[in-house]
Swiss-Prot record:
<dbReference type="InterPro" id="IPR012010">
    <property type="entry name" value="Urease_gamma"/>
</dbReference>
<dbReference type="InterPro" id="IPR002026">
    <property type="entry name" value="Urease_gamma/gamma-beta_su"/>
</dbReference>
<dbReference type="GO" id="GO:0009039">
    <property type="term" value="F:urease activity"/>
</dbReference>
<keyword id="KW-0963">Cytoplasm</keyword>
<dbReference type="GO" id="GO:0016151">
    <property type="term" value="F:nickel cation binding"/>
</dbReference>
<dbReference type="Pfam" id="PF00547">
    <property type="entry name" value="Urease_gamma"/>
</dbReference>
<comment type="pathway">
    <text>Nitrogen metabolism; urea degradation; CO(2) and NH(3) from urea (urease route): step 1/1.</text>
</comment>
<dbReference type="GO" id="GO:0043419">
    <property type="term" value="P:urea catabolic process"/>
</dbReference>
<dbReference type="InterPro" id="IPR050069">
    <property type="entry name" value="Urease_subunit"/>
</dbReference>
<protein>
    <recommendedName>
        <fullName>Urease subunit gamma</fullName>
        <ecNumber>3.5.1.5</ecNumber>
    </recommendedName>
</protein>
<keyword id="KW-0378">Hydrolase</keyword>
<comment type="similarity">
    <text>Belongs to the urease gamma subunit family.</text>
</comment>
<comment type="subunit">
    <text>Heterotrimer of UreA (gamma), UreB (beta) and UreC (alpha) subunits. Three heterotrimers associate to form the active enzyme.</text>
</comment>
<dbReference type="GO" id="GO:0005737">
    <property type="term" value="C:cytoplasm"/>
</dbReference>
<dbReference type="InterPro" id="IPR036463">
    <property type="entry name" value="Urease_gamma_sf"/>
</dbReference>
Amino acid sequence: MNLTPREKDKLLISMAAMVARRRLERGVKLNYPEAIALISDFVVEGARDGRPVAELMEAGAHVIGRSQVMEGVAEMIHDVQVEATFPDGTKLVTVHEPIR
């Protein structure tokens, strides 16, 4: 299988998000990379579903809460920027203060 670097990145994010979801199901708090992956995957999948940018920016801030991440992680993440493919092209989506 020949994948572009961008496709490899998307695959890694998707896999990390799957790991994060399993850890949340077990009650394990997420670390920084897991939290970023989960939020990023939410945005990428939402874009593929055709959800608008503004909706993803707002909804992305409600994917995970402070109680679901390790101490200090919420303070480390001010913005998450994801380049996602929408039906009308690729756009940069910024989720401000994603862990509340």
